Amino acid sequence: MDKNYLYAVANIRANELSLLSRADIDALIDAPDYKTALTLLDGKGYDTSFGSDYSAMLDGETEKTWSLIKSVAPSAEALDIFIVKNDFQNLKAVLKSEKTGDDAEKYLVSPSVIPKELLLKAVKERDFDSLPDFISDAAKKCLEVITKTENGQLCDIAADRACLEAMSGFAKSADNDICLLYTSDAADEL
């Protein structure tokens, strides 16, 4: 086995110790109040400085975990297939928020292949060519759909279809049976 893979597996296995166990989850459920739950999470290494904004805490932990995985993965680009759905979710959120006048940032999810700032700027400036190839044409089409029809569901359909096509493209590029199977399962979910 390649040394890079051995290192990656060993690093991830070592970090598994900080994951919540069944007993930890039970303790969180049984916690008498929010402060006690935060203390339990703090003991497991979670950043509890967000106070009552548990969503921000979970987002931070997700980003931290994803950064760790990408940093040790011998081929980090191969992992993009697992998060590209978030990019299309973010595209839908930005386009719909623009239509409703709402703040899109509160609807953006992570991790994502495309930095959130780039997506927000591209939509605002209608500079979809600045986006990666896997989403630039879809962004144009989704904007056209939502502008002409003012129907968010039709925009969702266009984005979801483009997402499946992008995932399929990532899977074919990876030339990996697991990625192909994942794409097939994801198509069943959408």
Where in this protein do the model-derived segments appear?
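Long, low-complexity, acidic Ser/Pro- and Gly-enriched intrinsically disordered regions
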Residues: 82-83, 95
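Single conserved hydrophobic/aromatic residue that forms the stacking wall/gate
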Residues: 182-190
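Short helix/loop capping segments that flank catalytic or ligand/cofactor-binding pockets
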Residues: 103-105
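Low-complexity, polar/charged sequence tracts that form flexible coils or short amphipathic helices
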Residues: 84-85, 184
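Extracellular/lumenal glycan-associated surfaces
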Residues: 88-101
